[in-house]
Amino acid sequence: MKLTVFLRPSRDRPDGVWVASEGPEGDPAGKEAEPAQPVSSLLGSPACGPIRAGLGWVRDGPRSHPYNFPAGSGGSILRSSSTPVQGTVPVDLASRQEEEEQSPDSTEEEPVTLPRRTTNDGFHLLKAGGSCFALISGTANQVKCYRFRVKKNHRHRYENCTTTWFTVADNGAERQGQAQILITFGSPSQRQDFLKHVPLPPGMNISGFTASLDF
């Protein structure tokens, strides 16, 4: 059996020739072995894959730069211009921009003013043939409590009842007199039934009258 030991390629032999040491069967040292396949032929082999070019090779001279710069460019590919751009905006364009800034955004919602309700729902406090009333007065707390009890327990004994109201004075929101409510009845007999079954708390006053429409 013949055993040959290969050493790394000599840098002075670019042709890929390997130098073998003395073998076990007495081969003299320094004997040239069979030339190895150059690395350049293996680069395109699909079985070997990519191999670093220049492995064991010596590059002659400096590597050329992949980009060629013109003389006096200082090695820069892009040169920035420091000259400012000067110009004037046309008058019509400036006025148009000013109008756009002043014009409101069309997407903004404008407040919608709803018309006041004027539909006649058929309710009238006074009837054409005359109406019977009971005017009840007292402190604000008394009148509110009385109206609450009447509406809750005696709703079938009258027709309509107003909210608590005051008579205004001459200056601003000044009030004069006591708080009052107005209760309407369909007939004098209904008002008598109301006065009979609905007691009036102490400190409150009641007055009855009949009113008719003049127009």
UniProtKB/Swiss-Prot annotation:
Q: Which Pfam families match?
A: PPV_E2_C
The cross-references to Gene3D superfamilies, in alphabetical order and at most eight, read: 3.30.70.330
Could you tell me the Gene Ontology terms of the biological process aspect for this record? Answer: regulation of DNA replication
The species this protein was found in: Bovine papillomavirus type 1
GO MF entries: DNA binding; DNA-binding transcription factor activity
List locations, semicolon-separated.
Answer: Host nucleus
May I have one GO cellular component term? host cell nucleus
UniProt KW keywords = Host nucleus
UniProt-annotated stretches for the region Disordered: 1-45, 68-87, 94-119
What this protein is reported to do is described as: Plays a role in limiting the replication of viral DNA in keratinocytes. Recruits the host NCoR/SMRT complex to viral replication foci to mediate repression of both viral replication and transcription.
Read off the InterPro entries from this record. Answer: E2/EBNA1_C_sf (IPR035975), Nucleotide-bd_a/b_plait_sf (IPR012677), Papillomavirus_E2_C (IPR000427)
Q: Which family does it belong to?
A: Belongs to the papillomaviridae E8^E2C protein family.
Ranges of compositional bias, category Acidic residues = 98-111
Specify the protein name.
Answer: Protein E8^E2C
